[in-house]
Structures are given as structure tokens and as C-alpha cells.
């Protein structure tokens, strides 16, 4: 059994991310949750917040996205995330992240 899950992040404009990951954490309406390979199937509403992709190390995210509202479909081997917006904030400064967050909140 593989230790990775296939991840696809989709916005209305394009596929933002499509790769395998060890774990994903997402901002669900009921709170933050994580998904690993083999997770039980589910469909969950997402709220605006941070989506973290753990590719090599399960203790440190490799990529972090600021997302708007959306929905995710999880099966044991893949996760599809459909969101209004997904902004890669991995390499941004704290001030740049605050600016992106403020702009996102105003657009919602």
C-alpha cells in the first residue's frame, strides 16, 4: 500500500496543484482536519483558511495555500479540492500574507 494520496486543487480558472502527498490539512467548516492515504470517503465544505500540503515530511508542510470557500471529496486514494481561490503563500513574507488575507476577506 502506498503511503501517499493523490491531490488535486482546482479553481474555476485552472488546476492549481496536482501531485502526490503524504498528508493534507484543510480548513473545514467544523474545524481543521487532515487527510492521509486510506482515509474514509467523505465530502466536506471548506471555509477560507490555510490548506497545507505535506509532500516529503509529515511534520513540515512543503506548500501552503490560502484558500477561499470550497468543497473537498476524499476517497482512500485521492482528494479533490475545489475552491474559489487558491493562492500559494509558501514563500511570502508575513506582511504579504496579511495583505493577501485582507484582500481575500474583502472579496468573499
Curated annotation (Swiss-Prot):
GO terms for cellular component: plasma membrane; proton-transporting ATP synthase complex. PANTHER family: ATP SYNTHASE DELTA/EPSILON CHAIN, ATP SYNTHASE EPSILON CHAIN, CHLOROPLASTIC. CDD domains: F1-ATPase_delta (cd12152). The gene is atpC. It is a peripheral membrane protein. Keywords: ATP synthesis, Cell inner membrane, Cell membrane, CF(1), Hydrogen ion transport, Ion transport, Membrane, Transport. It is found in: Cell inner membrane. This is ATP synthase epsilon chain. The lineage of its organism: Bacteria, Pseudomonadati, Pseudomonadota, Alphaproteobacteria, Rickettsiales. Produces ATP from ADP in the presence of a proton gradient across the membrane. Gene3D superfamilies: F0F1 ATP synthase delta/epsilon subunit, N-terminal (2.60.15.10). Pfam families: ATP-synt_DE_N. It comes from Rickettsia bellii (strain OSU 85-389).
Amino acid at each position: 500500500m502506498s503511503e501517499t494520496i493523490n491531490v488535486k486543487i482546482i479553481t474555476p480558472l485552472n488546476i492549481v496543484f496536482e501531485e502526490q502527498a503524504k498528508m493534507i490539512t484543510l480548513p473545514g467548516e467544523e474545524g481543521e482536519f487532515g487527510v492521509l492515504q486510506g482515509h474514509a470517503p467523505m465530502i466536506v465544505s471548506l471555509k477560507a483558511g490555510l490548506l497545507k500540503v505535506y509532500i516529503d515530511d509529515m511534520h513540515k508542510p512543503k506548500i501552503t495555500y490560502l484558500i477561499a470557500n470550497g468543497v473537498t471529496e476524499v476517497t482512500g486514494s485521492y482528494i479533490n479540492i475545489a475552491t474559489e481561490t487558491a493562492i500559494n503563500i509558501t514563500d511570502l513574507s508575513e506582511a504579504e500574507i496579511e495583505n493577501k488575507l485582507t484582500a481575500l476577506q474583502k472579496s468573499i
